[in-house]
Amino acid sequence: MQARALLPATLATLATLAVSVLAREPPAAPCPARCDVSRCPSPRCPGGYVPDLCNCCLVCAASEGEPCGRPLDSPCGDSLECVRGVCRCRWTHTVCGTDGHTYADVCALQAASRRALQISGTPVRQLQKGACPSGLHQLTSPRYKFNFIADVVEKIAPAVVHIELFLRHPLFGRNVPLSSGSGFIMSEAGLIVTNAHVVSSSNTASGRQQLKVQLQNGDAYEATIQDIDKKSDIATILIHPNKKLPVLLLGHSADLRPGEFVVAIGSPFALQNTVTTGIVSTAQRDGKELGLRDSDMDYIQTDAIINYGNSGGPLVNLDGEVIGINTLKVAAGISFAIPSDRITRFLSEFQDKHVKDWKKRFIGIRMRTITPSLVEELKTANPDFPAVSSGIYVQEVVPNSPSQRGGIQDGDIIVKVNGRPLVDSSELQEAVLNESSLLLEVRRGNDDLLFSIMPEVVM
């Protein structure tokens, strides 16, 4: 009798499950033969990122407490596992973070770290298992009052990068390492300053040289050289991140005094974010004294340890300002850095040269940055104007220009260039200046369109 009573309930449950399965969305379209990353969205994911079903784009992972295990559910994020259809943390013990807070588990700490990266660029790391000791919150303790070096490192580390130069072997397709070093981020859009010898090589082997840049949070990008001066040993390289990056500011090396505390940070022997400290031994050491006969530079001498791989990394003062680029080690306790005033001059010359180049390259549009006030103004004139929060509004297309020939029209909204979201018109100008081909994602009415534009060089 009891088995007969359970049968209707079981059938009802199966029927409900069948309806649930049938009610799901139909399967997605088959994977493309070739991934077009310019079509990938740029999600902000509290639960982290995972590859999509086609292993082409990054999509949001399921966060703790979200459903999982069904065909259309996203995989669980980092340190999570699917337990009875719900994402749960693999570990249940409390942990102490570098921000001084106690977290219920590792997953809660990682979620806080992702939020912190988006806000300040500084991740939260695990200090220890268990709750934080009470001393972490006692900001008047000697540990917190006098650890000024740690304060500087915490401020500058997110903007220091590791750089590797490879040679792509033409026959075997393998990357042969040529050199490695460090650099620091100068602009939120991805401009990086380093040494010229870090990003160039005299190796005569055939093959294509490639630059790889790794950020503190583990993100890696391919980089291109923007400008290089081998005599002064300064170079700038460019990456194309999908979000704004933390930056360092240049100080005035002319104000340096012998005896000042300085901090050197870089990647000696590929050990990323290695910190050494010291003082300024001499603020102006003539390059000719170092045996550099053609030198016209006065170097900063410091006793901060600089090893192979530190080259290109920043030498900073206690305010976190860059006062030099770590360049040369002569002996233990005797190292040298290119002064920041020389870097400033190099960047100014680079900017002047590129402004001239900008006048020679154009795509032929008059544009305005999308702002809430501009959207309101355009919606007043055209109620069907799309609801957009960022991008570039095409006010006018120049006749017979690359944009007109490529299909751009008045009133279009350019939302991405080469897969990167556009927030300001200067970002499109920079792309016109630095990239030979532009893949523009355009919003026209309710349609999203792709156009390939080749900037024109005016002699």
Swiss-Prot record:
The cross-references to InterPro entries, in alphabetical order and at most eight, read: Growth_fac_rcpt_cys_sf, IGFBP-like, Kazal_dom, Kazal_dom_sf, PDZ, PDZ_sf, Peptidase_S1_PA, Peptidase_S1C
Q: Which tissues carry this protein?
A: Expressed in the ovary, essentially in granulosa cells in a follicle-stage specific manner. Highest levels found in large luteinizing granulosa cells.
Q: What is its EC number?
A: 3.4.21.-
Q: What is a biological process (GO) this protein takes part in?
A: negative regulation of BMP signaling pathway
Q: Where is the region Serine protease?
A: 181-346
Q: Which CDD domains match?
A: cpPDZ_HtrA-like (cd06785), KAZAL_FS (cd00104)
Report keywords, A-Z: Disulfide bond, Hydrolase, Protease, Secreted, Serine protease, Signal
Where in this chain does the record put each Kazal-like domain? 76-134
Q: List the disulfide bonds.
A: 31-54, 35-56, 40-57, 45-60, 68-82, 76-87, 89-107, 96-132
Cite the IGFBP N-terminal domain residue spans from the record.
27-90
In the record, which residues are listed under signal peptide? 1-23
Q: Name one GO cellular component term.
A: extracellular region
Q: Which residues form the active site?
A: 197, 233, 311
Q: Describe its partners and assembly state.
A: Homotrimer. Interacts with TGFB1; the interaction inhibits TGFB-mediated signaling. Interacts with BMP4; the interaction inhibits BMP4-mediated signaling. Interacts with TGFB2, GDF5 and MYH9.
Its function, per the record, reads:
Serine protease that cleaves beta-casein/CSN2 as well as several extracellular matrix (ECM) proteoglycans such as decorin/DCN, biglycan/BGN and fibronectin/FN1. Inhibits signaling mediated by TGF-beta family proteins possibly indirectly by degradation of these ECM proteoglycans. May act as a tumor suppressor. Negatively regulates, in vitro, trophoblast invasion during placental development and may be involved in the development of the placenta in vivo. May also have a role in ovarian development, granulosa cell differentiation and luteinization.
**Its family?**
Belongs to the peptidase S1C family.
The record ties this protein, via PANTHER family, to: SERINE PROTEASE FAMILY S1C HTRA-RELATED, SERINE PROTEASE HTRA3
Q: What is this protein called?
A: Serine protease HTRA3
